[in-house]
Amino acid sequence: MTPRRKSRMTVILFVLLGISIASALVLYALRQNIDLFYTPTEVVYGKNEDATQKPSVGQRIRVGGMVVAGTVERDPKSLKVKFDLNDIGPSISVEYEGILPDLFREGQGIVAQGVLKTPTLLEATEVLAKHDENYVPPELDAQMQKVHKPMGVADLKGESERDRQEKAYQKTSMQEGQK
C-alpha cells in the first residue's frame, strides 16, 4: 500500500469512526427522552399482557385513561393533587403538583406524563385534558374496542331506542285516531 493510499484510508477510517460515535450519542440521548404511551392496564400487566413489556420504575412514560370518579384528592395547603386513572382494567394512582387544566374532571379522559415511582404510582409532571367530550385517545380507543363490543345498530336488532320510541308514539297516535 502506498503512503498516499494509507493516509486516505486513515482519514476515511477516522471519519467513519466519528460518524459512528456521533450516531450512537444521538440515539442514546433520544432513548432517554422518548416518553412511551401506555394505558393503565398496560402499566400494570404490560403491553399485550406480556410482563416483559411493562414499564420499569423510574421510567418516563405517558399514561392515558379516564379519571376515576371519587378519587380526586386535593391538598388544601398546596397545589398537590392525587387521583386514580383507569381504562378497562386496573387503575393506577397519579400524583401531580401544579395547576390542572380547566377541562380536568372526574370521568374525563386525560393523558398524564411523568415518572413511574412504583408499579402503580405515576408522579406526573404534566397533565393534559381532552378538549372534546367524545374524544378518546386512539391508543385507548383501540384497547377499549378489544374488550368492549361497541354499541351499535346490530346490538339493538336493527333499530335504536329513539326508533322504538317513535314507533310506539306512532302506534298510539294511530290508535287514538281510530277511536
From Swiss-Prot:
Binding locations of heme: 131, 135
State the family it belongs to.
Belongs to the CcmE/CycJ family.
Compositional bias, Basic and acidic residues, is annotated for 156-169
- Show which residues sit on the Cytoplasmic side of the membrane: 1-8
Q: Which domain of life is it from?
A: Bacteria
Q: Which residues cross the membrane?
A: 9-29
Native source species:
Pasteurella multocida (strain Pm70)
The membrane topology term of the UniProt record is: Single-pass type II membrane protein
Identify the residue ranges that face the Periplasmic compartment according to the record.
Answer: 30-179
GO BP annotation list:
cytochrome complex assembly
NCBIfam families the UniProt entry points to: PRK13165.1 (NF009638), PRK13254.1-1 (NF009727), PRK13254.1-3 (NF009729)
The entry's localization annotation reads: Cell inner membrane
What's a single GO MF annotation on this record?
Answer: heme binding
Q: List the disulfide bonds.
A: none
**InterPro entries in the cross-refs:** CcmE, CcmE-like_sf, NA-bd_OB-fold
Q: Any idea what this protein is called?
A: Cytochrome c-type biogenesis protein CcmE
Q: Which UniProt keywords apply?
A: Cell inner membrane, Cell membrane, Cytochrome c-type biogenesis, Heme, Iron, Membrane, Metal-binding, Signal-anchor, Transmembrane, Transmembrane helix
Q: Where is this region: Disordered?
A: 151-179
Query: In what ranges is there compositional bias, type Polar residues?
Result: 170-179
Q: What does this protein do?
A: Heme chaperone required for the biogenesis of c-type cytochromes. Transiently binds heme delivered by CcmC and transfers the heme to apo-cytochromes in a process facilitated by CcmF and CcmH.
Q: What Pfam families has UniProt attached to this entry? A: CcmE (PF03100)
Cellular-component GO terms for this entry: plasma membrane
